[in-house]
């Protein structure tokens, strides 16, 4: 867990799902939320995505098999992105320049040529913003998150190694003079570049509304410095530009307006409207 404080702005980063779950389950409620109605433990499954905080925690820790099956069906039909190529010098029977010593020895592959090969093993960091406001429907949250899943799948298919983070930004409701002051930005590593794409593991943090409405809100309920101004509504969501400013890597906005089928390469992803 890495904490950075800049005045009233606090940035907290967790290196893994395990580290984050350990923190929110072992840290007591803060003074502001100790006697408040908690989103993390509220009843009702549709808006929250799960029936309880315990169910949400288990799905985050152990995977979401039911959604995994549905996602795998969608991802099987996923078209590949255009591969990223690099130019490599090779020896061939044809080329643009002879290698005289090899030619004199009668070696067939005595010409210098260039060959395009798919670029492999480039590591990139993707930050998925899940800072949705309370009026965002469960269906919309799931649709937007599935778009992100498709993008990650395409990148991995193309040969990129992806560090994937889920991010929340929330601010104190502005005062009459427009001052928001208190802000919290949370980033959780849900997939490291050295891990293969595990659909079951990523299904919950990327797709289930409980990731925000129970799990991430639980962080707000326990983080010690959160003030009472967050109790009713958990603050208001930071925008994608805030996320891009606070965290290194490529930001996937909360709402991806671009047609996913038109995203053909990494530059298209970097160019998503923020």
Enumerate the language-model features and the residues they cover.
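Acidic, low-complexity intrinsically disordered regions
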Residues: 1-125, 130-146, 150-274
């Amino acid at each position: 867990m890495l904490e950075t404080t800049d005045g009233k702005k606090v940035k907290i980063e967790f290196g893994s799902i395990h580290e984050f779950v350990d923190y929110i389950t072992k840290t007591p409620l803060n003074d502001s939320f100790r006697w408040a109605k908690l989103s993390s433990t509220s009843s009702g499954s549709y808006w929250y995505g799960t029936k309880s905080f315990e169910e949400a925690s288990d799905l985050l820790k152990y995977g979401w098999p039911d959604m995994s099956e549905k996602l795998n069906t969608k991802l099987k039909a996923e078209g590949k992105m255009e591969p990223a190529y690099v130019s490599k010098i090779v020896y061939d029977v044809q080329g643009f320049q002879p290698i005289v010593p090899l030619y004199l020895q009668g070696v067939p592959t005595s010409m210098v040529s260039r060959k395009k090969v798919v670029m492999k093993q480039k590591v990139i960091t993707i930050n998925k913003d899940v800072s949705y406001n309370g009026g965002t429907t469960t269906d919309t949250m799931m649709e937007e998150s599935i778009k992100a899943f498709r993008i990650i799948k395409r990148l991995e298919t193309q040969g990129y190694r992806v560090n994937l983070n889920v991010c929340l930004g929330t601010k104190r409701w502005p005062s009459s003079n427009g001052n928001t002051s208190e802000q919290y930005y949370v980033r959780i590593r849900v997939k490291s570049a050295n891990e293969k794409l595990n659909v079951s593991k990523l299904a919950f943090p990327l797709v289930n509304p409980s990731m925000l409405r129970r799990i991430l809100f639980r962080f707000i309920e326990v983080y010690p410095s959160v003030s009472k101004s967050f109790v009713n509504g958990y603050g208001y969501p930071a925008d994608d530009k805030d996320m891009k400013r606070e965290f290194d890597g490529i930001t996937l906005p909360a709402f991806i307006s671009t047609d996913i089928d038109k995203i053909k390469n990494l530059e298209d992803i970097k160019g998503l409207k923020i």
